[in-house]
UniProtKB/Swiss-Prot annotation:
One of its GO terms (molecular function) is nucleic acid binding. Pfam families: DEAD. InterPro entries: DEAD/DEAH_box_helicase_dom (IPR011545), Helicase_ATP-bd (IPR014001), P-loop_NTPase (IPR027417), Y'_ATP-dependent_helicase (IPR050978). It comes from Saccharomyces cerevisiae (strain ATCC 204508 / S288c) (Baker's yeast). Residues 257-281 are annotated as: Disordered. Disulfide bonds: none annotated. SMART domains: DEXDc. This is Uncharacterized protein YHR218W. Transmembrane segments: none annotated. Signal peptide: none annotated.
Length: 603
């Protein structure tokens, strides 16, 4: 193949056929640079550029042709480096917990990985968050001798001090679950300023100490990534390529222990932080959204629905729970605010809705996407491909909410979105959970909900929990089961609604306000529906008599029978097949089987 096309061949093999045109930005007739640096106008593929921007905060670096091939390996094997990072942090956690004073190397891990106040919570909630962001740095460390941008670093070290990447890979091999001696020695050398890459780990150590000491509410991931990136920028001499603000003074906490005094370190590089712009909201936004969805004659059902819809859209309350009767219009309480958010031009909001069962998905997506007011897609698309920049609302089931892949994507939202779309104006909107009482009442599924506790709820602007059957005790227990604080001590009557004050704490640390639209002394919901409570000797026989009578009068009717156990569901379905066309379903069925049953119901 012609030399000038050889690099394109490499990229095409990496980027997967159907996405090549989406990610390549090369001109068609690429000149031959004979293995030298490629000028910045010939941008690297988008995914590689994303990693470069994440680590170095510059859009383009001058890599040679071999560098591109090496960097592309990261995206071909991203899952491997994620798992490698998780495993390294888990080992560090084990060492820090079990042998904190064994040696200087072990103390290094104790300081770097845990910081005593959070050593117990690291393994449960922090490893995957830090591991996801550690993966690119781990990749660079393992390939430090293959990339031209690190040639000066390798050349500056004596032969015996150069990083032996092959030995490092062997030492991190899964077949050696406890031995990480070479990796730990490299980390120890870095901490003791034996090479310039030590700035990265020293910064990480200092930031974690500062976080635990001051109890900062700023997300640790953002702080750690930001200052680590600054160290890379400083070390590579890229300050001129990245617009930073400088200060001539330094805080004592910003001085890394053991750092030699030098005029080169008199300036502190501060990462430019941009606040997300927020367009002003008004009650008129909800009215406009209602007319888009229902037409010009739109009106709210009652004053309560109006005021609660405004509370969800306008107030800063981070977490809201609503109990309302069936048919009241709970969906509109979040549907209209979502349409209003989608109308904002300067900020793109991405929200998520989770329902308890697969059979509810299709109809839910159709309802929420009608009239083209919202772009709706399955959560599975987000889990597999990430945010596409178009979808306003992703809809999934509880299993998706509890999945590790979903929680990992939310944990890395800030970095991935900023680098993918070159803006921080793509923002997480609402997390909406329908029929949330199931977290507490569906005992047989509770083991499946454990992963929800790992979700970073604070990343969302607001969490909304809806139910028709969630009295305070059930609602409070359900919220605590997924890792939230629970309900506020006093549930709010809708008539006590007041505009909430600004909140400085995160969603997960603030109690949820519950609004109860079911009054004990009020008229029974759905009063036009005939209801009978009967005590009988044989419930299945009595139910069969009622069904036979119904279908004799109304042959085209449909009926739903709710049984108390999964075994009874299957027994009734088998015994009644000679009388009716029966479709049965229960919670222990897999998603595929539920989908087949759902099609049968629709048919």
């Amino acid at each position: 193949m012609d030399r000038k096309r050889s690099f394109e061949k490499i990229v095409v093999s990496v980027m997967v056929g159907k996405n090549v045109q989406k990610f390549l930005t090369f001109v068609e007739d690429e000149p031959d640079f004979q293995g030298g640096p490629i000028p910045s106008k010939y941008l690297i593929p988008k995914k590689i550029n994303l990693m470069v921007y994440t680590l170095f905060q510059v859009h383009t670096l001058k890599f040679n042709r071999k560098d591109y091939d090496t960097l592309s390996l990261f995206y071909l094997n991203r899952g491997y480096y994620n798992e490698l990072s998780f495993r390294v942090l888990e080992r560090c956690y084990e060492i820090a917990s079990a042998r904190p004073n064994d040696s200087s190397t072990m103390r290094t891990f104790t300081d770097f990985v845990s910081g005593t106040p959070i050593v117990r919570s690291l393994q449960k909630s922090t490893i995957r968050k830090y591991g996801y962001n550690l993966a690119p740095y781990m990749f660079l460390l393992l390939h430090v001798d293959e990339l031209s941008i690190f040639s000066a670093y390798q050349a500056s070290l004596p032969g015996e001090k150069k990083v032996d990447t092959e030995r490092l890979k062997r030492d991190l091999c899964p077949r050696k679950p406890t031995e990480i001696k070479y990796f730990s020695q490299i980390c120890n050398d870095m901490m003791n300023k034996k090479d310039r890459l030590g700035d990265v780990l020293a910064t990480a150590q200092r930031i974690r100490r500062r976080y635990n000491k001051n109890g900062s509410s700023e997300p640790r991931l953002k702080t750690l990534d930001g200052l680590t990136s600054e160290r890379w920028i400083q070390w590579l001499g890229l300050e001129s390529d990245y617009h930073c603000s400088f200060s001539s003074t330094r805080n004592a906490e910003d001085v890394v222990a053991g750092e030699a005094a030098s005029s080169d370190h008199d300036q502190k590089i501060s990462r430019v932080t941009r606040k997300r712009p927020r367009e002003p909201k008004s009650t008129n936004d909800i009215l406009v959204a209602g007319r888009k969805l229902f037409g010009s004659s739109f009106e709210f059902r009652d004053l309560h629905q109006l005021r609660l819809c405004h509370e969800i859209y306008m107030a800063d309350t981070p977490s809201v729970a609503v109990q309302a009767p069936p048919g009241y219009g709970k969906t509109e309480l979040f549907h209209l605010p979502l349409i209003a958010l989608a109308s904002k031009g300067d900020v793109k909001y991405v929200s998520f809705l989770f329902v308890p069962y697969t059979v509810l998905l299709a109809n839910c997506m159709i309802r929420l996407g009608r009239r083209g007011c919202l772009n709706v897609a399955p959560v599975r698309n987000f889990i597999e491909e990430g945010c596409d920049g178009v979808t306003d609302l992703y809809v999934g089931i509880y299993d998706d909410l509890a999945s590790t892949n979903f929680t990992d994507r939310i944990a890395a939202w800030e970095n991935i979105v900023e680098c993918t779309f070159r803006t921080n104006n793509v923002k997480l909107g609402y997390l909406i959970v329908d029929e949330f009482h199931n977290f507490e009442t569906e005992v047989y599924r509770q083991s499946q909900f454990g992963g929800i506790t790992n979700l970073d709820f604070d990343a969302f602007e607001k969490a909304i929990f809806l139910s028709g059957t969630a009295p305070e005790a059930v609602a409070d227990a359900a919220l605590q089961r997924i890792g939230l604080t629970g309900l506020a001590k006093k549930s709010m009557d809708i008539n006590e609604l007041k505009r909430s004050e600004d909140l400085s704490r995160g969603l997960s640390s603030y109690p949820t306000r519950m609004f109860n639209l079911i009054k004990e002394k009020s008229e029974v919901p759905l009063g036009h529906v005939h209801k009978i409570w009967k005590k009988v000797e044989s419930q299945p026989e009595e139910a069969l008599k009622l069904l036979l009578a119904l279908f004799e009068i109304e042959p085209e009717s449909k009926a739903i029978v709710v049984a108390s156990t999964t075994n009874e569901v299957e027994e009734l379905a088998c015994s009644w097949r000679k009388y009716f066309r029966v479709v049965w379903i229960h919670g222990k069925l897999g998603c595929c089987r539920k989908g087949v049953s759902h099609k049968g119901v629709c048919h």
